[in-house]
């Protein structure tokens, strides 16, 4: 089975870059990057020093429900190319020692017992293991330090 690391959809990102409200109904904040620790969730690259970026609330779920976590993310303020879907861990994530992987069912709710902090070099193996289960529709990869949404992982 192949897996796919998936960045935020371009259609959603473009409306946010055009000034549409975020998941909390607020206009995204616009800042200038110092080049350190500003990962865009669309191109899956760091926003370079001097480039503008957006800070906004993102809810990576199709509808409101108790498990629909919302949290802060960064996006380039100007259009960027969406990261190609791939079965290879995007380079952006490789320097970080670990991430949270968590499985969700087709009802977009957490599948209990699936969430864990996983060493980065084991992400692909753990994703294969979790997505091999019939009760898991997709995974979220999140920061192990701040729980920030990084990307979605699906069967490929």
Role assignments for model-derived ranges:
Residues 1-17:
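Extended boundary segments
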Residues 18-98, 102-116:
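Conserved mixed alpha/beta catalytic, RNA-binding, or beta-rich assembly cores of soluble enzyme
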Residues 143-148:
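Short Gly/Ser/Thr- and Asp/Glu-enriched loop/turn motifs at secondary-structure junctions
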Residues 102-138, 142, 155:
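Short, hydrophobic/π-rich interface segment
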Residues 149-156:
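C-terminal edge-of-domain segments
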């Amino acid at each position: 089975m192949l897996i796919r690391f998936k960045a935020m959809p371009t259609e959603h990102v473009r409306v946010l870059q055009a000034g549409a409200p975020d998941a909390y109904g607020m206009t995204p904040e616009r800042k200038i990057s110092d080049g350190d620790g500003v990962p865009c969730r669309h191109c899956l690259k760091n926003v370079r020093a001097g480039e503008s970026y957006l800070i906004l609330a993102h809810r990576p779920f199709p509808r409101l429900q108790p498990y629909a976590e919302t949290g802060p993310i960064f996006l380039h303020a100007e259009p960027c190319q969406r990261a190609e879907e791939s079965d290879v861990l995007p380079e952006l994530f490789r320097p970080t020692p670990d991430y949270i992987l968590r499985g969700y069912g087709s009802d977009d709710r957490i599948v209990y017992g699936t969430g864990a902090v996983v060493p980065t070099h084991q992400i692909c193996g753990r994703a294969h293991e979790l997505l091999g289960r019939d009760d898991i529709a997709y995974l979220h990869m999140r920061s192990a330090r701040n729980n920030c949404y990084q990307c979605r992982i699906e069967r490929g």
